[in-house]
Amino acid sequence: MTVRDWANRGQTYVNARAPNLLGRFRSTDDEDENNPSTELATDTTSAYGSTAASVVTMANSKPDDVSLYATSSHHHEYFTGSAWIHPVYTKEQMDALEVNHRKTETFSDRVALRAILLMRIIFDLCTGYKHPKEGEAHLPKFRMTTRQWLDRFLFLESIAGVPGMVAGMIRHLHSLRALRRDRAWIESLVEEAYNERMHLLTFLKLQKPSVQMRTGLLIGQIIFYNLFFISYLISPATCHRFVGYLEEEAVITYTRCLEDIDAGRLPELASMEVPDIARTYWHMEDDCTMRDLIQYVRADEAKHCEVNHTFGNLHQTSDRNPFALVIDNGRPQPSKDLTTFRSVGWRRDEIAN
């Protein structure tokens, strides 16, 4: 059977399906005479006739929003749901959220905290941030513009999404080698990385990073990924403590931003429209504001703080993940939402087994 015969046999199916398929994938720009995909489709002549034209049009068409950094508010049929359903946070829970610094108790705790303090210095230099003392936030030298805040968020989230994926990957490979289950650690770690990436994708809808920023993110990710990978092989408990302290710093960042919004120092940021990706992921109300969005992100970071400080207290190979399954023993237990939130983490003897 020749190629032409195969094309003719499939032409009936393609003609019946193409209008529906093209309607889902074709952009409004495809109708423009200057659009390459339209020109390619109309100028193509071959033995395949309309079949070839249809396939070429589909292959070269593009959705409205082809860039991660686009600010278009268009809705798309091809938008996929979240791999993990985000827990619902109430406004009362987020308003009452307090994150306390966990004091160091062991040598590994001190190593983790000092590593974070060093990383914080580099992070502040890269984003032009200076942390004010009590009552000094209004001074000009501590002022942060909307662009500076969004740059800081982008930098933070691009780094914060690394530990969960690295830890999850290492534990996944260990589970394969050991031929046994991981007691549900992998799921929470990968979900954490996914959550941080959703933060990043949300802020990318609000601001496109500069070339310098993207270069810095690339270099930072390469260095941080490899250092964290090696460190997790050596001492996973120390790495979880490190992430716990990292999330404490993230909470401080978003808390400071909320204070600036409330004080009227960020009118441009406060007036921005919440991206659709955020509305869907966090189940936000129709009248939500940027302040609400920052509160949701802050609550996520606080939750990661609790999870990783708890993981740092547990036996790394034999203890179960207490956030994956809640066992009722008559005492408060860790949960996926904020109902039993404890920022400094849960001690091993507090968790039901």
Curated annotation (Swiss-Prot):
The EC code for this enzyme is: 1.-.-.-
Grouped into one coarse class, the protein's main location is: mitochondrion
Which GO molecular function annotation, any one, does this entry have? metal ion binding
Report residues binding Fe cation 2: E196, E247, E301, H304
**Can you tell me where the transmembrane regions are?**
153-173, 217-237
The coenzyme or cofactor needed here is: Fe cation
Region of interest (Disordered), ranges? 25-45
Q: Which GO terms describe its cellular component?
A: mitochondrial inner membrane; mitochondrion
Where does this polypeptide localize?
A: Mitochondrion inner membrane
Pfam families listed in its UniProt record? AOX
Q: How is the cofactor bound?
A: Binds 2 iron ions per subunit.
Q: How does it sit in the membrane?
A: Multi-pass membrane protein
Residues holding Fe cation 1 = E157, E196, H199, E301
Mind telling me which Gene3D superfamilies this protein's record contains?
Alternative oxidase
- Composition bias, Polar residues: 35-45
Instruction: Give the InterPro entries listed for this entry.
Output: AOX, AOX_sf
GO terms in the biological process aspect are: alternative respiration
Function of this protein? Catalyzes cyanide-resistant oxygen consumption. May increase respiration when the cytochrome respiratory pathway is restricted, or in response to low temperatures.
Family per similarity comment = Belongs to the alternative oxidase family.
What name is this protein filed under? Alternative oxidase, mitochondrial
Q: What organism does the record attribute this protein to?
A: Yarrowia lipolytica (strain CLIB 122 / E 150) (Yeast)
Write the lineage as a comma-separated list: Eukaryota, Fungi, Dikarya, Ascomycota, Saccharomycotina
